[in-house]
From Swiss-Prot:
Taxonomic lineage: Bacteria, Pseudomonadati, Pseudomonadota, Alphaproteobacteria, Hyphomicrobiales
Species, as recorded: Rhizobium meliloti (strain 1021)
Recorded metabolic or biological pathway in which this protein acts: Glycan metabolism; exopolysaccharide biosynthesis
S-S bonds: none
Gene Ontology CC terms: plasma membrane
Listed GO biological process terms: polysaccharide biosynthetic process
InterPro entries, alphabetized: Bact_polysacc_biosynth/exp (IPR050445), CobQ/CobB/MinD/ParA_Nub-bd_dom (IPR002586), EPS_ExoP-like (IPR005700), GNVR (IPR032807), LPS_length_determ_N_term (IPR003856), P-loop_NTPase (IPR027417), Wzc-like_C (IPR005702)
Family as reported in the entry's similarity comment: To B.solanacearum EpsB.
Protein name: Succinoglycan biosynthesis transport protein ExoP
Protein's UniProt keywords contain rRNA processing: no
Periplasmic side: 67-689
Classification via Gene3D superfamilies: P-loop containing nucleotide triphosphate hydrolases
Any one GO molecular-function label of the UniProt entry: protein tyrosine kinase activity
Length: 786
């Protein structure tokens, strides 16, 4: 019994010497993006076809609707010859008028007028239009609710009014009113399943709107005329009474004078005019004085900076010249300081000159301030003098003017009443004239015609939108699938995620063969020649001999690569115990174990295949549904292990099944970790060159962990495109012993037709079609067909 310890070099993860995909590039990989697009193109195309089919179904069952449109121009010029002074219209008023017109056209009152004029309350097309399935359900629910709730009897008049209101509500829903761009045109469109009815109602709306405008103008003018006539009668009586009162007051007080006023009043008027001028001069002088005083009060430096002098003043030329010189010197000083430094002699000289000019400007400002102060005091004195003169004259004429004031009050009252009367008289005559001009400020510029083609649904647009929507939904779903891709697709995924060696791809087998493998069992014991026909009742032999029947296939090449990896990494061991494990059930590890063992046996090596998946013995079920003895009976001491071995006469493969029906009563993990199991493995090492053990899945049970110390190496099986990568990574990282004994990972059930779609353009999977001269894939189908 010579046994060499497993080489520790296999426990070194490949991730330590190979960069991961996440570390390779932080930018968007265009190759992967294009590959994803091509990979999901069929899915997106299927969604596009589906949505186009839905769009076509919608077009097939949808009710066609026709739209007829009329255009109304709101033109103020239509009534300008009927108005003496047309009101000018600005853009804001125009927007308001058009908005008001749109709301009037949408109003329920105008809809009722259209219903009454066209008798739409008796039109079945309006009251009972074609309904969608949703509308039919709503109508059914409404009817059912009405049956249970009941209600008072409806009179014929109420029913007629209800139909009228319903027709108005329906045409309001089918009406579309909008302004045409920024023009004064309003477009009125009506939508109906009957093209002739659509044109009729659109015309009816235009006619009803024009009639409404005429009626509104006439009614407003009539109401204004009645009110103006009442006001005119009252104003006429009051104006006559005021005129008589003025005449009587003049005659009683003898108030007659030239130009209708006293001399003292004329003098008072002249003085008042002079006082107004003097007040203006005083205010102007005060403003100038305050301006210069505020500048001077700021000090020399700020006064120079803030000395803003009006160009209309004649005494500021000196200040302007000095200020110009100040700015010029300051500019030169900054240039010299920037070029030669602030301590340069010329810069110092220029700053001194600038300060001197500032002092001169300040002195000039002080002189101007004193001058304007004198002007302000003179103007103030003149204003005070005029006030005193006015007060003196006012005292002399106060007695005479008291009666004149009363007279003027009477005259003003009479004049105001006369002016008001004349104004109302003119408005009354204008309103009377407008009643005889029935002109609306709108006209129809485009008559509604009968549409010849439906406006909805639009076939081309519907199908195009369906295609776009299908592309968007399909693209979103494809992107979701791509972002949710968390499985193993490529050998590079094995290296980057798990840090282990990938042993290759095992192609996906036909479903017909696997279904038979679950329904019937194989028969052993008789030796058959290689050229004999394989019976349909032996699917296990077919599945387990694929590697033998198709030696030049991709399937067989993967197992040869696995054998080579085992021989290299377990070199020095005369007998090797190799476990076959997976993370989840139904990943095909039993078929992998059977073919791997068959390859070893066919190569002339003494090989034992043990089904150690005691809880779910898939390998045993394929061999014989109810074996009498097996692994469990051996471990509990009921039988010896050679008694339970089955031998494949073709490959000379020895197979030890899981056991009989009683194996479910025992704790599988305790059996696999028992001394009896260790003794069995030791005995098997002495009798066989290779011992291949089919273990239970690693995630659901601990059986694989219990057996791991007895294995020299582990071949890990993952299902292509289904096994979650994070699950496998976490399981292996949480079990260092198992992880250290993993010889490599096999990607099982690989769809070889889809494999290249998941690879980069420079990936090895893209060039597998060039390996055809080395492989003969059709032998798998020929030699394993039923």
């Amino acid at each position: 019994m010579n046994r060499t310890a497993p080489m520790k070099q296999r426990s070194v993860p490949l991730s330590s010497i190979m960069p991961s995909e996440e570390q390779s590039d932080g930018f968007i990989d265009l190759d992967r993006l294009v590959a994803a697009v091509f990979r999901r193109a069929r899915l997106v195309a299927a969604f596009v076809v589906l949505f186009i089919a839905l769009g076509a179904a919608y077009l097939l069952f949808a009710t066609p609707y026709y739209t007829s449109m009329t255009q109304i121009l709101l033109d103020e010029n239509l009534s300008k010859y009927a108005e003496e002074e047309p009101t000018p219209v600005n853009s804001q008023m125009l927007d308001t008028q058009i908005a008001s017109a749109v709301e009037i056209l949408k109003s329920g009152e105008l809809a009722l007028r259209v219903v009454d004029k066209l008798k739409l309350s008796e039109n079945d097309t309006i009251l009972n239009p074609p309904r969608s399935p949703v509308d039919m359900v709503k109508e059914w629910l409404k009817t059912a609710t009405g049956l249970f709730s009941g209600g008072p009897d409806v009179t014929e008049e109420a029913a007629r009014n209800g139909r009228r209101q319903k027709a108005a509500a329906i045409i309001q829903q089918s009406l579309a009113v909008e302004r045409v761009s920024r023009s004064s045109v309003v477009a009125v469109a009506f939508r109906s399943s009957d093209p002739l009815l659509a044109a009729t109602i659109a015309r009816g709306y235009a006619s009803a709107y024009l009639t409404d405008q005429l009626n509104a103008n006439f009614e407003a003018t009539e109401r204004a005329s009645v009110w103006l006539q009442e006001r005119l009668t009252d104003l006429q009586q009051r104006s006559q009474a005021a005129a008589l009162e003025v005449a009587h007051f003049r005659a009683e007080n003898g108030l007659t004078a030239a130009r209708g006023e006293l001399m003292s009043e004329q003098q008072m008027a002249d003085l008042n005019s002079q006082l107004i001028v003097a007040q203006a001069d005083t205010a102007s002088a005060s403003a100038r004085y305050d301006q210069y005083k505020s500048i001077v009060d700021q000090g020399p430096e700020n006064a120079v900076k803030n000395a803003t002098i009006s160009s209309k003043e004649g005494d500021n030329s000196v200040i302007r010249d000095l200020r110009t010189r100040y700015l010029t010197v300051g500019k030169r000083e900054r240039e010299v300081s920037d070029n030669f430094g602030a301590d340069h002699p010329q810069a110092v000289s220029l700053r001194a000159e600038q300060e001197d000019v500032a002092r001169q400007i300040y002195q000039e400002l002080q002189q101007l301030t004193a001058s304007y102060k004198n002007e302000y005091e003179v103007a103030q004195s003149r204003e005070e003098s005029l006030r005193k003169s006015i007060q003196g004259i006012a005292g002399k004429t106060s007695d005479a003017s008291e009666q004149l004031v009363q007279l003027r009050e009477l005259e003003q009252k009479a004049a105001a009443l006369k002016t008001l009367y004349e104004s109302y008289l003119g408005r009354y005559e204008q309103a009377t004239q407008q009643q005889s001009f029935p002109i609306a400020k709108a006209r129809v510029i485009s008559e509604a015609g009968v549409p010849v083609s439906p406006s909805s649904p639009k076939k081309t647009m519907t199908l195009a939108l369906s295609a776009v929507l299908g592309m968007m939904v399909g693209g979103a779903y494809a992107a979701f699938l791509e972002f949710r891709e968390r499985t193993f697709r490529l050998e590079g995924n094995i290296r980057s995620i798990l840090g282990h060696r990938s042993l290759g791809y095992v192609p996906l087998l036909g479903t017909r063969m696997k279904k038979k493998a679950q329904l019937v069992h194989a028969h052993f014991g008789s030796v058959k020649r290689h050229d004999e026909a394989v019976d349909d009742t032996m699917p296990f032999q077919r599945l387990s001999r694929i590697v033998v029947d198709a030696p030049r296939s991709t399937f067989a090449e993967t197992f040869r690569n696995a054998k080579l990896a085992c021989d290299q990494m377990l070199a020095g061991s005369e007998s090797r115990v190799i476990a076959i494990a997976s993370a989840l059930p139904d990943e095909g590890k039993s078929i992998i174990a059977a073919n791997f063992a068959a390859l070893l046996a066919a190569s002339g090596k003494r090989t034992l295949l043990i089904d150690a998946d005691i809880r779910k013995p898939g390998l045993t079920q394929m061999i014989t549904p109810a074996p009498r003895t097996g692994l469990v009976e051996t471990l509990i001491g009921e039988a010896s292990w050679p008694a339970g071995i089955k031998v494949d006469q073709r490959t000379k493969l020895a197979i030890l099944p899981a056991g009989g029906a009683s194996h479910q009563r025992h704790q599988s993990n305790e059996l696999l970790a028992s001394p009896a199991m260790a003794n069995l493995i030791e005995n098997a090492r002495n009798a066989f060159d290779y011992v291949v053990v089919d273990l239970a899945a690693l995630a659901p049970v601990v059986d694989a962990k219990a057996f791991a110390p007895l294995a020299d190496g582990i071949l890990f099986v993952v299902e292509w495109g289904r096994t979650p990568s994070r699950l496998v990574r976490d399981l292996l990282h949480s079990e260092p012993l198992i992880n250290s004994k993993v010889l490599g990972v096999i990607l099982n059930k690989t769809d070889m037709n889809e494999l290249g779609k998941y690879s980069d353009f420079d990936g090895a999977e893209k060039y597998r079609h060039r390996y055809g001269k080395y492989y003969v894939e059709n032998t798998i189908t020929e030699n394993t067909a039923a």
